[in-house]
């Protein structure tokens, strides 16, 4: 079983909507949006549309006027790519969400913010290899394509024994340099190269494998597979969902503050201001509990191993 970026976005959205209890109004495009500067949009129905925000794909658009006879919308001159979203084209029959409670753009941002925050507690396990040269003690951390790798710490290192035994012998003396000299290794102050220095005896020409901890990666494309892009096990997916959910719920009450609009006052008579906060705290508690469980599991799988740095 795999989970993609799109799957996680949909799971966050359906949780926030109470499965099917709350549904945003929607319609469809009756003609493709073929340009990122188009200011006239044709839809199948304008019965639920008014002046304000619509969402097509991940783009937010500000609608200035609408024609209920011709089912067309007129976008404000500044209305494409509204609120920092990216203006994009859209195919005919694409979904048009009217005043989305949680825009996909914001949901995706919350997911990646959660992944970055998790880096303080949990790490992705990665590995790289290099061929040992007895004349060289220091090696740059590079992936198979020659790009720099970024490590938090070294978990373990082994080298492949000579002969048919297929044994990988632990490297006892190895040191990580997270900010290698720019003059020697290149890179920059913002993105320095990282190196490992080996002080053990290793048979020349043998492969050395370094297992290291790294920050979880973020997601970008809808088709990105969670485990591949982040480096985390699939069991961490629900942590990301819970983290994104509590982040999004945090900002519901400020939108209903009494100084915002008369409509907010009317809503407050039915649902007290601050009611969202208690729900958010419950979800945050679940998030921290699951994160602690996953941290413990990771520590059991990769216990601290003693190695010398010199």
What are these model-predicted stretches?
Residues 1-33, 47-82, 86-310:
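Glycine-enriched, solvent-exposed interface loops adjoining structured elements
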Residues 38-44, 83:
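Short alpha-helix capping/helix-loop boundary micro-motifs
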């Amino acid at each position: 079983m795999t989970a993609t970026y799109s799957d996680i976005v949909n799971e966050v959205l359906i949780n926030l909507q109470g499965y099917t209890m709350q549904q945003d109004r929607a319609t469809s495009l009756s003609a493709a949006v073929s340009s990122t500067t188009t200011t006239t949009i044709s839809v199948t129905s304008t019965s639920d549309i008014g002046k304000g925000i619509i969402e097509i794909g991940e783009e937010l658009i500000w609608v200035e006027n609408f024609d209920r006879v011709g089912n067309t919308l007129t976008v404000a001159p500044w209305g494409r790519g509204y609120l920092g979203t990216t203006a994009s084209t859209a195919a005919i029959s694409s979904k048009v969400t009217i005043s989305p409670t949680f825009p996909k753009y914001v949901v995706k941002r919350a997911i990646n913010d959660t992944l970055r925050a998790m880096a303080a507690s949990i790490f992705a396990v990665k590995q790289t290899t290099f061929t040992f040269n007895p004349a060289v003690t220091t090696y740059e951390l590079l992936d198979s394509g020659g790009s720099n790798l970024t490590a938090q710490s070294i978990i373990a290192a082994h080298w492949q024994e000579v002969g048919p035994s297929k044994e990988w012998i632990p490297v006892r003396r190895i040191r990580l340099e997270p900010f290698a000299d720019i003059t020697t290794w290149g890179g920059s102050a913002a993105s320095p190269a990282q190196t490992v220095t080996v002080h053990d005896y290793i048979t020349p020409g043998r492969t050395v494998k370094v297992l290291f901890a790294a920050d979880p990666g973020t997601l970008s494309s809808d088709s990105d597979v969670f485990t591949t892009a982040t480096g985390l096990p699939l069991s961490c997916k629900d942590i990301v969902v819970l983290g994104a959910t509590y982040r999004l719920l945090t900002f519901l009450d400020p939108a209903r503050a009494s100084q915002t609009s008369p409509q907010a006052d009317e809503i407050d008579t039915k649902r007290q201001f601050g009611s969202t906060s208690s729900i958010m705290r419950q979800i945050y508690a679940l998030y921290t509990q699951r994160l602690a469980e996953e941290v413990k599991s990771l520590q059991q799988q990769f216990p601290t191993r003693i190695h010398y740095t010199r």
